[in-house]
């Protein structure tokens, strides 16, 4: 089978992980295995743990990683459960972990998943098809206040009140069933000037609903905490984000990992006992170059941040 998936910032991620052929690595967002293939083929006696909440990704990876399955373990799970996954896999410490956040290209391209505002499909948006909450429930059941909040907080949508009001008004007549129905409602709630902007008028709203359905932002803090705790000294944590909300959480978490004593400056000696867990290797995020952007426009918003577990911090 021809392999055409283009993983974002691939070379930069491999360099960031500073790989050893006998190391233990975690790809916490397997997707279509683009990064995992590159990691797996660099291992000899090492091991790769691949995690994804989307069973379709796990199934596809069995073929795409077939030549290296002797060193690969596939796990169907949410990366928020990273600590438990590592324990279950018998991993006492990893030498590198990679997380490529957000919705994957195959999920966007499969209209039936309901992620796209360009193709008609039932309102779903679940990354894990076995999860109970769908976009249909969010759109048709959640209150005006809840809708306005997620549109504003998760979508950074300045027309959140008007869009939330339009959704509630529309569903009073009949349930909103499909993605393009929702797109029309969103467009109808926005002023003409907003419809002429370069960005699709439904992009921010769809992002907000998707984040709410999948609990994406809520999963980040426990994952980041478990990741740094699960690294061996000198191990690397690499995280790719695609929008400012994710990037802000990752940036602050890594800054906190690198921060030592938090005692007030007037204290003569440290009493908090806090020591840095990691050091930042990227003061500014790594972004895609022009060559990658020409081949893969979806890489335009990608930002890679990297931290390294401190040698003097015990697991």
Question: Which residue stretches match the model-derived regions?
Answer:
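S-adenosyl-L-methionine-dependent methyltransferase catalytic core, i.e., the SAM/SAH-binding region
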Residues: 1-315
């Amino acid at each position: 089978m021809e392999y055409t998936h283009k993983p974002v910032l691939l070379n930069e991620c491999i360099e960031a992980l500073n790989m050893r052929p006998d190391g233990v690595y975690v790809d916490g967002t397997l997707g279509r295995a683009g990064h995992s293939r590159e990691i797996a083929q660099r291992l000899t006696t090492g091991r790769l743990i691949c995690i994804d909440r989307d069973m379709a990704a796990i199934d596809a990876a069995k073929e795409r990683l077939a030549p290296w399955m002797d060193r690969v373990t596939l796990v169907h799970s949410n990366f928020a459960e990273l600590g438990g996954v590592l324990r279950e896999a018998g991993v006492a410490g990893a030498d590198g972990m990679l997380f490529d956040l957000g919705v994957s290209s195959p999920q966007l391209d499969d209209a039936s998943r309901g992620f796209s505002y360009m193709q008609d499909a039932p309102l779903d948006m679940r990354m894990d098809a076995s999860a109970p909450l769908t976009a249909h429930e969010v759109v048709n059941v959640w209150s005006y206040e809840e809708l306005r909040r997620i549109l504003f907080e998760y979508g950074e949508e300045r027309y959140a009140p008007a869009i939330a009001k339009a959704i509630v008004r529309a569903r009073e007549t009949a349930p909103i069933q499909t993605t393009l129905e929702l797109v029309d409602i969103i467009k109808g709630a926005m002023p003409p000037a907003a419809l002429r902007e370069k960005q699709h008028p439904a992009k921010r709203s769809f992002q907000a609903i998707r984040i709410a359905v999948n609990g994406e932002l809520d999963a980040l803090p426990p994952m980041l905490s478990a990741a740094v705790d699960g690294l061996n000294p000198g191990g690397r944590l690499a995280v790719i984000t695609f929008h400012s909300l994710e990037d802000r959480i990752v940036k602050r978490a890594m800054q906190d990992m690198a921060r030592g004593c938090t005692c007030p400056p007037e204290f003569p000696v440290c009493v908090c006992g806090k020591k840095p867990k990691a050091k930042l290797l990227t003061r500014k995020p790594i972004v895609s170059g022009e060559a990658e952007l020409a081949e893969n426009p979806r890489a335009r918003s990608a930002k890679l941040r990297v931290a390294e577990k401190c040698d003097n911090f015990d697991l």
